[in-house]
């Protein structure tokens, strides 16, 4: 469960290390986001000479959350960290590699590019 002011790790090689959620997309009163949801983020930490700079505002899709997500078969999945992948204006990932596992829920949300780049889909 990600809300405004939550900090997330970045799970791609765009150059950002940490981002903070500044808006949950999908309705004016929407408070929380989970795996597969798109949020607006601000870059809080970035490595030098990277594709993104500190202070940039971008969209991101959540790929891992500490809060468990219930699946249709009744099972739950949760991760050790909150992580997101940065997206361009066109909805494509900014980075060319994805680090760490991602949740299978992204497949239902049509993030096939992220699924194909990920080393493991849980």
Curated annotation (Swiss-Prot):
GO terms for molecular function: large ribosomal subunit rRNA binding; structural constituent of ribosome. Transmembrane segments: none annotated. The keyword Electron transport does not apply. Keywords: Ribonucleoprotein, Ribosomal protein, RNA-binding, rRNA-binding. One of its GO terms (cellular component) is cytosolic large ribosomal subunit. The keyword Disulfide bond does not apply. GO terms for biological process: translation. Binds to 23S rRNA. Forms part of two intersubunit bridges in the 70S ribosome. PANTHER family: 50S/60S RIBOSOMAL PROTEIN L14/L23 (PTHR11761), LARGE RIBOSOMAL SUBUNIT PROTEIN UL14M (PTHR11761:SF3). HAMAP family: Ribosomal_uL14 (MF_01367). NCBIfam families: rplN_bact (TIGR01067). Part of the 50S ribosomal subunit. Forms a cluster with proteins L3 and L19. In the 70S ribosome, L14 and L19 interact and together make contacts with the 16S rRNA in bridges B5 and B8. This is Large ribosomal subunit protein uL14. The gene is rplN.
